[in-house]
Amino acid sequence: MKKYLVTLLAILLVSCSSATDDTNVSLESVDTSTTSTTEATTTTITTTTTVYIEEPWAVDEFGIELLEMSPNMKTQFEELMSFVERRVGLEFTEFPLFNLYTVNGYQEYNAVSYLDDFEEDYEEGEWERAVLSENMWGLTTSTPDQMKNLITEFQRCASAGSYNLLDKILRVPIQKGQDKLNLWEQSVIVHELTHSLQGQHFQVSEWYQEMKELDDFSAYPGIRALMEAQADYVQVKWEDGLDAYDRTTMNSQVPNISCRVQLPSYFYIPNDLYYSFGPQLVKEILNKEKMTGLNEALYRYKNEGLNSLPTAEQVYDSAKFFTNDRYDDVSITTLEIENYQLIDEGTLGSLDIVYVLQDFIGRVESTIAAVGLGGGSWKDYVDSNGNLVMSVKISGDTKQDLKEIYDAYIHWANVQDRFDEVVDFSGGKLYKGKTNVWISTDGSFVRLFLSQDISIIESQANNLNSY
């Protein structure tokens, strides 16, 4: 289903501008010719204009300018490393990799690197199915090309700094031509240095690679939330050391990183888990178990493997974290659908529920449904024309939890004007429209079945309550 981003973004949605001081300037003469013509003569006037061409100190793999770290910046960087080590209680095993950009260069890198990985991240037809799925869930009406452009813009504008799980490089935009990092830049670097330290100790590259090989990112949201919350905590502690004047100065230094188009609000729903619920959970962990307890949770992959990582449900509801409540395995039958074949399948997590429901029924009701999740599974089917059929099966922790999940999906369907009518069908509610959605519960599971072709749902009438 959803492929999560490779990059750990420090989503501190901020506004700012970048300085463009000129350094390392070379001179080059350029001839500009202007020709004027009359009936009698032709006169050619040649003028020589001197333009300044700045030679970059270095460029990255995409030819984007990198900025040099001055000796004073390196001293600041090392001081920030020491601060992060003291707060996290771990030491860097090697000097962190880093790239410093201008603000514009950093935004360009985010967009270009996403597009460069795009073909590798999606198999043939997979992107089109992913966008069609979001259309059928009512999240968007965008075409695959439009959605690609929107996500590229989201990548371009959504972060103030980043740490990449795979190449392990910390990337931060700074003002050009300065000898020292300003306070805002130092604050962002503290956040990203925390991620770099995590990368050196918690095998984050390894667990991401394992998820990618399995083509299953269901374990990603929970561990991502803990990583972001730890980085946020260390960053806040660094900012707490500033006096009122320095804090005001830091706020004035925030660059103008803004999106050029209005992005769908549901793009930001995972960030609510990472940057709102995550810090709430980490605050409880620190109160009960100190930083040692948080590090132990982040060490789980290294010590116990992928299936031990915290779930999104544990982040939404801290009580489930401390009891290590896990998702149940939910078996879902493969259906025989004429002219369709099974193309993909996987598990459903709490973030998936909130992701689909929140924009329609609100944060509170969708989160209540998510924290009552027992477990879930889904299967996708496709025909030769790329049409999609989706089946979902969900259990609750209790009968009441299951009812809340069912009620949330019914509410989700009822508030959408894309459905022409709703009828009782095969023990459930059938919402008819361009996408047809069947929702039912038998007291043990909630089932959803989505198809663009109503005849497919009708042909599955005897199977809908048993898959």
Name each model feature, range by range.
Residues 17-25:
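Bacterial lipoprotein signal-peptidase II cleavage site
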Residues 106-128, 143-170:
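Catalytic zinc-binding patch centered on the HExxH motif and its immediate surroundings
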Residues 386-467:
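C-terminal soluble interaction/assembly domains
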Residues 262-393:
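Pan-zinc metallopeptidase signature
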Residues 25-51:
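Extracellular mucin-like PTS domains
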Residues 80, 200-205, 209-253:
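Post-HExxH zinc-binding segment in Zn-dependent metallohydrolases
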